[in-house]
Amino acid sequence: MNAAREIMQSEDGYPSAFRVSDPEETDMMLKLYNVDDSPLRYFLAGFEPMKRSLMLGFTEGDKGYSKNVRKTIARVARKYHARSLTGLVCKSWEHGRFNDPYLRDTLLDFGIATDTLECTVNWSNMAQVHEEVRKICHARPNTVVTTHLSHAYPQGANLYFIFIIHSETCEDFKKYHTTILDAIQKSGAAISHHHGVGKMFAPWLEGYMGRKKFGIYHVLKDYFDKDYLMNPGETIGLDLEEKDKKFLRDDIK
């Protein structure tokens, strides 16, 4: 995390793709991409399982610019005692990253449910959010939870929480899903990054923003659609009943 922050705040340019995985996801990716069974495993000597973090990145653009970004990443990586795995893992990830979602429906047939929840954090509270949300995710026995950031900025980044659980009913799935969204709001993270806030996430939005800020949306809605005819019950929960809203932080009521 600290290395990623330093790279994004270096003012030397940004990688076009940038991803940092937590230890649980790192161990899974190194197995999925056959690093543990390839000659690259010798580069991992001294790195303990569940205590290592995988960083992937690309640079694009002018040759000089890309070279400068690469030099900065290499310098910061050395500072934090990282070790290069060549470009093999990046290429494996790039060519296989869209394959996993196709397994979702098949897994559901066997009672295995998986989903991705994302949030937005500042660098200053990233470690806290990661720890608190993962603690809630793992409170359910026999749960796989992987986490990574994949959209980084000088001010912060997103966090993806991907869980895999055994769940036979929609009610059970929604109950677990709700506990994670509760944890995200309590931790101080924004309830979404770029996936947006639809019907499922809407109850948590006002509790994150606060009534005054969220009230601006009500003013616009009342001006343009005072009868609430457009997309009722959807979008960001402007027509939610008070009892259905989630206010879980002491500093926002």
Language-model features: where?
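Activity-critical C-terminal alpha-helical subdomain
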Residues: G198-K253
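C-terminal substrate-recognition/cap domain of FAD-linked oxidoreductases
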Residues: N2-T179, A183, S187
